[in-house]
Amino acid sequence: MKTLLIFLAFLSSIFASLIGLTPPSKDSFYSPPVGFATAKPGDILKIRNTPSAPSSLYLPIVVKNAWQLLIRSEDSFGNPNAFVATLIQPLNANPSKLVSYQSWEDASHIDCSPSYGMQFKSPATTVTTQIDMTLIVPLLQNGYYVIIPDYEGPKSTFTVGRQSGKATLNSIRAALQTGAFSGIKKTAKVALWGYSGGSLATGWAISLQSKYAPELKENLIGAAVGGFATNITAVAEAVDGTVFSGFIPLALNGLANEYPDFKKRLYGEVKLSARSTMEKGSQNCLAASLVGYPMSQYFTGQNRAFEKGWGLLQDEVFNKTIEDNLLLKLDKTYLPQVPVLIYHGTIDEIIPIKDANAQYQIWCDRGIQSLEFAEDLSAGHLAETFTGAPAALSWIDARFSGKPAVNGCQRTIRSSNVLYPGISITIRIYFEGISKTIFGVNLGSGVNADKSISNKFFAYIRKYI
């Protein structure tokens, strides 16, 4: 199976170079029309069928329809912008059920956008989006329409909360307007789901919703967030100098793309010897950055990229920019008004569980109506992507079925989230196969297996990069 996938990916890359998809940076569809600023947030500016079929692990997905929508939105400061979202209609579509899926793009260049990377014939640079698409397939199999926003927006503002949250909400607004061609009812129920970088966008969306998109209250039925990113500083502390250090230049450039003063300070502080690496962080997609810059030190060690080390975070510009994008720092008026599931691996080596714990406690103390925390003792960040996905899907299915969510706050610690109640055998077998394909291990196979998953993941994506 692995050999077949690698061969198909190789063929798709060659095919793309000959016939290929036009990248967003060169595709006029991604540019808004003159006068677009007069449209309301959530209005659809352009519509087209996806240039190529959606695909997962470089294999085309059979669906009834797939469209790209250019949607009016706003940046963090309320300035008008426009972004693309992909709306997929499955063969057995239920017009009253829609899932907003926030992909873990985790990059700061528009050519890494999910709308591009999720298509058949997309380049190998977007291999992580092809992996992420494996989580969308079972949603489609269940008959749910799925909207996947390029929530980072036209500037690719990775880790910027308000931009991401607003775009997510505006993609839902837009999807609910498409009934004339998609069949989606304006009264459709909507669930949100995001893991890792996608959890950041999802978390901000449900936190902003009551103020920014109050009319969606009747549509939204819940949100599942996994590998929950609530504190980007803690992520930097966790990955600096590790095999995952490639996240840091991506995140810093994502912030720089939204905040000009931050960008000026960032490139003024980085050592000349590290400037090239930092600049490539604004050009590389996730896989290339992880493979290209493992073990790099930005804030620690004698050869760190920033002479001031962690002291740089005390700089006024750095501190304000980062504080503005910490979900943990939002006040009580941003309390989510929908049921929430948090699922997280205890030994998450990228997004420490302590900050998901902190967010859980904050929301509970503020009286959230329904919040469930499913902690997985045996999973790190990569493993929980697939160990936790069946739990998230089961939880979403329960919301669509009208089953009551937990009342108040409930925390459960399991040896593996594969043991989450209600997971169907079919879904478990599906994710078991994905886990074996990418990691070579069974779902929930224990801490010892998890320790080797990072190496297997890197080996997998190196075959594409």
Swiss-Prot record:
Source organism: Candida albicans (strain SC5314 / ATCC MYA-2876)
Family: Belongs to the AB hydrolase superfamily. Lipase family. Class Lip subfamily.
Signal peptide: 1-16
Keyword Secreted assigned: yes
Subcellular location: Secreted
Protein name, UniProt field: Lipase 10
Induction: Expression is not induced in medium containing Tween 40 as the sole source of carbon.
Reactions accelerated catalytically: a triacylglycerol + H2O = a diacylglycerol + a fatty acid + H(+)
Taxonomic lineage of the native organism: Eukaryota, Fungi, Dikarya, Ascomycota, Saccharomycotina
Disulphide bridges: C112-C285, C364-C409
Function of the protein: Secreted lipase that is able to hydrolyze both the neutral triacylglycerols and the monopalmitate ester Tween 40, allowing the use of hydrolyzed products as carbon sources. Has broad lipolytic activity, which may be important for colonization and subsequent infection, therefore contributing to the persistence and virulence in human tissue.
Residues annotated as the enzyme's active site: S196 (charge relay system), D348 (charge relay system), H381 (charge relay system)
